[in-house]
Structures are given as C-alpha cells and as structure tokens.
Amino acid sequence: DAELAERYRAFAQRCMVQARGVYQGFVEAGILLMDPPQVEALTLNSWIIMTSWVRFLCTTFGSHGDLSQDMLRRGIYQVLTLEGGYASAAARPAIEALQQKLFVPLDSPVDGSAR
C-alpha cells in the first residue's frame, strides 16, 4: 500500500528528527560528548536497533521469538551501550549503573551458548 508506506516514511523521519533533538540536548547538557556527524550517526544507529530488535529476537531464537520483558529491556541496553561510548566523565557512572540494571544475557549464538 503506497499510502501506508508514505505515512510510515513520514513517521520515521519525524521520529529521527525528534531523536536527534534529544541527543543534541544531551550534548548541550554535557551528558554526551559528540559533534554533529556523530549525533546523526547515533540517531540512525539507535533507530535501526529500536525498529529491528523484535525481528532480531524472532530470527535468532526461532519463530516463537523471546518477547519477554527481559529481552525487550535488552534492546534498550543495546541502544544505551551505543550512547555510552560518548558519555562525559560526569555522566558515565549513572550510565554504567543503568547498563547494569538493563543487561540481560542473550543465551544465544551471539554470546556463544546454545538455547
């Protein structure tokens, strides 16, 4: 459906503009240390993870997938890990604490174990 595809494209573009604004706000607040190309790349990479995470779970863990709260939380962890590489020294302890709270082992071929 061409109309649905166009509406989704507009939605995706709005989301990425808003996400870029959030990341730019983190830069201005001194939470993340990034230049504009890095903000753009992080925005795009975060969008890719957020929109592909459920599909990843289904293809990695089989047709039933693992859509538990833990595995959805792990998707948030993946994005936070990308962001953490740009964290300022002042923000790093809070980000690391949040990473520890969100981390869930995958128990999949990605981490070398079998399900």
Predicted features by range, described:
Residues 55-115:
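C-terminal peripheral helix-coil segments that are non-catalytic and often amphipathic
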Residues 4, 35-39, 64-68, 72:
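Residue-level recognition of alpha-helical structural elements
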Residues 3-29, 40-55, 73-81:
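Amphipathic alpha-helical packing segments from all-alpha helical-bundle domains
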